[in-house]
Amino acid sequence: KKDWRKLRELNHLSEVFDAYDTFVIDLWGVIHNGIKINERAMEVVDNLKKNSKKIVFLSNAPRPSAKVINFLLTMKMDKQYLSNVMTSGEAAMHAINQNKFGKTFFHLGPPRDASIFEKVKENKTTIDSCDFILCTGLFDEDDADLNKPKLHENDLDYYKKFLSKYTSKKLVCTNPDFTVHRGNKEEYCAGYIAKIFEELGGKVTYYGKPHKEIYDMCFKANEKVLAIGDNLRTDIKGANNLNKDCL
């Protein structure tokens, strides 16, 4: 565990540029807020690039990396910074495509996340007949698979009742975050649904921060890494688990 006495206060990230080869940077909450880019953060990223540092954007987005790159481009981020983007959705997608948890799955999440199972979409089925539950988030109110329109995103009791009958199935969580802020609005993420499932007695496999597997896809063990994020439970815990410095 990190020793709190070794904490150091920085005025600017440039003070520690020379100490690290690789900077692993969270996206949502650091680089953008779901609506617009943080221009001051991008000034730092640009400075890192000019100093020939390896920049890895690591996100718990439950979608493939290519989808997140496209999203960043729509927010006018220059593609020169996007050489290394890894998402929890990308990591989960590889496992799903290899039938790691079985063949058939039930998608618990909004239709916009369907890109994660594009290559195996024919294996999507009902929750009663599936091999595993693929959780990318909460249902949207217009999700045709639900047959219950007007489900409110904050109705967590619904999810407790809905999942209570299926705790014998495996649940794969593609975003360990509990909540996210989209602008000024706080929204629940797949991690909160996975937490409910575990409290009911179900077993969950997580993809994304703070779990080690996704970091193995971002850098080698001998790289001098600084992880930058806004979430103690995911960004900071993940770095601490690997004994890497964090900000």
Residue ranges and their predicted role:
Residues 1-247:
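HAD-like aspartate-dependent phosphatase fold
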